[in-house]
Amino acid sequence: MRSIIVIGGGAAGLMAAIKAAEQGASVTLLEANEKPGKKLLATGNGRCNFTNVVQEKQYYRGSDPEYAWQILQQFPMQDTLQFFSRLGIYARNRNGWLYPNSDQAAAVLEVLLMEASHRKVKIKTRESVCEILPGSEGWSVKTKTWEYGADAVIVACGSPASNVEGATDWG
């Protein structure tokens, strides 16, 4: 069985961990905060704007908007809607911004954590990653307290795009 470490316990990290586990991988998710999903709870003023109807290249900013656009083409809006509806989260359209019907970011986090648990994703909190190194048989991921080994590593730790507690250069 392939082992995968996911760095980051936000929406992207949880979704990556779930998708990897669905494919049969043994997944460990490392989250620096005391709980996963801390920044997720703040999205959309606590309502969780989880995708948008209009996704066009000109709406993405940053040092490499083309790269963001390419990534989004691999998991478009319809795939996002299917992923969440399979977990029982249905979208409400508000002027092109899609929110869960409940208008609660906490509901989105809850179903992501439930699915991760169902898929046997091991979630390690308060694990701040310091170093990622290639090894002879995969990867070594060092935290302040432990060293983990895996066949592959997914870095999904976001960014300090907003002044939200827990945001660092590592996400």
Predicted ranges, named:
Residues 1-12, 28:
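Beta1/beta-strand and adjacent pyrophosphate-binding region of the FAD-binding site
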Residues 13-15, 157:
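Short glycine/serine/threonine-rich phosphate/pyrophosphate-binding segments
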Residues 86-111, 118:
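Mobile, glycine/GP-rich and aromatic-enriched active-site lid/loop segments adjacent to catalytic centers
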Residues 45-95:
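Glycine-rich active-site loop/strand segments that organize a redox cofactor
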Residues 106-107, 111-171:
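Predominantly flavin-linked oxidoreductase catalytic cores and closely associated redox partners
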Residues 5, 21-45:
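Glycine-rich FAD pyrophosphate-binding loop
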